[in-house]
Amino acid sequence: MAWPRIFQRGALLSRFSHHHMVVFLLTFFSYSLLHASRKTFSNVKVSISKQWTPSAFNKSTELLPVEIWSSNHLFPSAEEATLFLGMLDTIFLFSYAVGLFISGIVGDRLNLRWVLSFGMCSSALVVFVFGTLTEWLHFYNKGLYCSLWIVNGLLQSTGWPCVVAVMGNWFGKAGRGVVFGLWSACASVGNILGACLASSVLQYGYEYAFLVTAAVQFAGGIIIFFGLLVSPEEIGIPGIETEDNFEEDSHRPLINGAENEDEAEPNYSIQEGNTVTQVKAISFYQACCLPGVIAYSLAYACLKLVNYSFFFWLPFYLSNNFGWKEAEADQLSIWYDVGGIIGGTLQGFISDMLQKRAPVLALSLLLAIGSLVGYSRSPNDKSINALLMAVTGFFIGGPSNMISSAISADLGRQELIQGSSEALATVTGIVDGTGSIGAAVGQYLVSLIQDNLGWMWVFYFFILMTSCTVLFISPLIVRETCSLMQRRQTRVLNE
């Protein structure tokens, strides 16, 4: 089996400069900060609910005038406040999903650095107004909260398509799986960062949790504006298209099923003066028609539903099903993220060695079905539960990270469009936007199934969605597996 050039002796030093490392870190932490603000909202829900409802020791006491003493009581009970907070989650996910489709198109037409910086800074201001300014002014309004969270979802959606596009500009397809697998841990790091920032100041009031998160995110947006290099061409380094077009036959784009014998002419042009011609962004419809985009988008809608359900519901499931303390359940749920980080990195490495993604995904998702069956029958033991949780995260979180990052980059840099059009951000927006719609619908369905049928049927639902993920990419799995076998037979005959 041929090793990708990036793993061969001396290839890493020759291909990657300190600029690559800076881009890796800046994009990693920019998305981590966006995820941190989402996690902050989850961590302060209890405090917000208490602020929006009457205090227990005041229920039997009528304080006059009522307009002053009860102005912050949006809801008569904590249950109604919790329901509204859950509705805000759904509103955010739907607006985020819609925004992903728009942000991808905008990112391919404007400077990615501008779009990402604008999204981070503007989102930070919205978070500040939502959680801090309204509390300082004691202004509480359900319509305002909903409007702000819709805007926040749209602004946060600028993050993922832009950072994936920038990473795709800097890192070629050789080694992209392992690089993106490691890089996609940014969301998990952001969750941890958000929890730490919120818990450090929550004792002073939930508004300060929003203030600290918003301030750090705004500062990150400023750093991105002045420090991020969108592509190697900005500093005179040859683009990855130039390098990738001279790869040998075995290093063709990983989402292509067939390996044509006829070598196509490099699909890029050079102007006089050795400057790359200005490329044109493709339309939304053209991006959808690219091979593999619709298949992976539908597959990701099913898989992200399962992955985000674990993200939102895992601590509640552990507390509700096993009777463990909320703090213990929160700490234990980290093992799912750990499994996802390891899974995304290792599976990306294997797919780089095979130069194919779909067969690796297929095997992982089939094993994910078994891990879901095993985890649904986990005993009331924290150690065993953590182990099964990590295994489940490995086989579900790993493929989810790979589709949203490495595969999206592959899809946006196919030979069909390479060097003649920009599609990376648009394709990433389509894939992640479709996935987010599935995740938004899934949160409601999980709640409905759990209330009426119980947790075991929730796991049956997860198994069904994981099976649908395999079904949607089955043509790609068959095509790439056959191509892999043909290549192996050719190598054996040549030997």
Curated annotation (Swiss-Prot):
Glycans are attached at N58, N267. It is found in: Endoplasmic reticulum membrane; Lysosome membrane. It comes from the Eukaryota. Its main location: endoplasmic reticulum. It is a multi-pass membrane protein. Unlike the other SLC37 members, lacks glucose-6-phosphate antiporter activity. In osteoclasts, forms a transporter complex with ATRAID for nitrogen-containing-bisphophonates (N-BPs) required for releasing N-BP molecules that have trafficked to lysosomes through fluid-phase endocytosis into the cytosol. Interacts with ATRAID; the interaction is direct and both proteins are mutually dependent for their stability. GO terms for molecular function: xenobiotic transmembrane transporter activity. The lineage of its organism: Eukaryota, Metazoa, Chordata, Craniata, Vertebrata. One of its GO terms (biological process) is xenobiotic transmembrane transport. GO terms for cellular component: endoplasmic reticulum membrane; lysosomal membrane. Belongs to the major facilitator superfamily. Organophosphate:Pi antiporter (OPA) (TC 2.A.1.4) family. The chain crosses the membrane at residues 16-36, 82-102, 114-134, 148-168, 178-198, 210-230, 298-318, 334-354, 358-378, 387-407, 429-449, 453-473. It comes from Bos taurus. This is Sugar phosphate exchanger 3. Glycosylated. Keywords: Endoplasmic reticulum, Glycoprotein, Lysosome, Membrane, Sugar transport, Transmembrane, Transmembrane helix, Transport.
